[in-house]
């Protein structure tokens, strides 16, 4: 998987950098978690301050285009980004916790 930065804009008003990127890959389509980790390492940004906005994969091609945002602090990210974007666009514990909270416990499933 190779990531190429296509555009980078500083948005001072929202305390973030807006990044456009392109990914070329072979084999299976990379997951959001893989893209998030590699993009964070590439930009030297903390993972809790980076959110992936969108990923667009064209049918039949091994290329993805997308956009991401890097905030100056995690507080700004939580203040500006909607919750569903934070859960979808950030890799890590937040995704696992949301799944664990939605899953019914074993006792409740047996009682039904």
UniProtKB/Swiss-Prot annotation:
Coiled-coil features, chain-numbered ranges: none
Record region (Disordered): 88-112
Ribosomal protein as UniProt keyword: yes
GO-annotated molecular function: structural constituent of ribosome
Glycoprotein in keyword set: no
Keywords in alphabetical order: Ribonucleoprotein, Ribosomal protein
GO biological process: translation
Tree of life domain: Archaea
One GO cellular component term: ribosome
InterPro entries: Nucleotide-bd_a/b_plait_sf, Ribosomal_eS24, Ribosomal_uL23/eL15/eS24_sf
Family: Belongs to the eukaryotic ribosomal protein eS24 family.
Protein name from the UniProt record: Small ribosomal subunit protein eS24
Source organism per UniProt: Methanospirillum hungatei JF-1 (strain ATCC 27890 / DSM 864 / NBRC 100397 / JF-1)
Organismal lineage: Archaea, Methanobacteriati, Methanobacteriota, Stenosarchaea group, Methanomicrobia
Gene name linked to the record: rps24e
């Amino acid at each position: 998987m190779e990531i190429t930065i296509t555009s980078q804009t500083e948005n001072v008003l929202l305390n973030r950098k807006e990044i456009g990127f392109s990914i070329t890959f072979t084999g299976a389509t990379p997951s959001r978690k893989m893209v998030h980790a590699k993009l964070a390492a590439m930009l030297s940004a903390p993972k809790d301050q980076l959110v992936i906005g969108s990923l667009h994969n064209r049918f039949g091609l091994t290329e993805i285009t997308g956009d991401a945002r890097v905030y100056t602090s995690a507080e700004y990210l939580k203040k500006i980004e909607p919750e569903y974007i934070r859960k979808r666009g950030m890799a890590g514990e937040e995704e696992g916790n949301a799944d664990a909270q939605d899953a019914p416990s074993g006792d409740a499933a047996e009682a039904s």
